[in-house]
């Protein structure tokens, strides 16, 4: 199975908004990312509009449509966001948990607890052809609940693994990676497409990319940060090279 790279450009907007300016433009970063080999663009329109704006979603949708690449619209499970997505008609909609006081998304959706609300949002989004993904922890019960909710895709939260690996907590990182592998296998077995993301950098990407059922990685903050030093195309090229190396090694082991 080939492995796609979705580039999240939220933090280009973070830099823009730090000065209340009109630049740097997220759409320009998105275009550079696609030229550099990204398979799609991810953008999270948060309820507080702390980075990506409604206007950004409009121009990103137009760019991705013109280039024949998917826009993955990350969003909270609210009537407002569902309405915006229904109007934008993105290729994909990824439902994520959201709390105003958090710095970034801190965990996965509780699909079991929010089953009706999530299922209703999923059904509405699918009426306009959006491929619905649910951002979750690699928990078997949550994965099964995604099927019940009508999702086509799960995105497994890799943040805890990446944090443990960077902290040198090897045993904890290996335990979380084991859960990610089991979760990906179960989701695939249940007919769900499997994505993964959050906190991935050059040091942590290969073990995640080596999970054979994963079809897509969504990476943003690290790539935008690395782009400050080496440029966005080079940052993407190196990430893709590591992803591809992990898949080649997987084939050799098989």
From Swiss-Prot:
The active site is at residues 44, 74, 198. GO terms for cellular component: cytosol. InterPro entries: Aldolase_TIM, PyrdxlP_synth_PdxJ, Pyridoxine-5'_phos_synth. Its main location: cytoplasm. It catalyses: 3-amino-2-oxopropyl phosphate + 1-deoxy-D-xylulose 5-phosphate = pyridoxine 5'-phosphate + phosphate + 2 H2O + H(+). The record marks 155 as: Transition state stabilizer. One of its GO terms (biological process) is pyridoxine biosynthetic process. CDD domains: PNPsynthase. Its EC number is 2.6.99.2. GO terms for molecular function: pyridoxine 5'-phosphate synthase activity. Pathway: Cofactor biosynthesis; pyridoxine 5'-phosphate biosynthesis; pyridoxine 5'-phosphate from D-erythrose 4-phosphate: step 5/5. 1-deoxy-D-xylulose 5-phosphate binds at residues 10-11, 46, 51, 104. It is an enzyme of class 2 (transferase). Keywords: Cytoplasm, Pyridoxine biosynthesis, Transferase. 3-amino-2-oxopropyl phosphate binds at residues 8, 19, 199, 220-221. Belongs to the PNP synthase family. Homooctamer; tetramer of dimers. NCBIfam families: pdxJ, PRK05265.1-2, PRK05265.1-3, PRK05265.1-5. Catalyzes the complicated ring closure reaction between the two acyclic compounds 1-deoxy-D-xylulose-5-phosphate (DXP) and 3-amino-2-oxopropyl phosphate (1-amino-acetone-3-phosphate or AAP) to form pyridoxine 5'-phosphate (PNP) and inorganic phosphate. This is Pyridoxine 5'-phosphate synthase. It comes from Caulobacter vibrioides (strain NA1000 / CB15N) (Caulobacter crescentus).
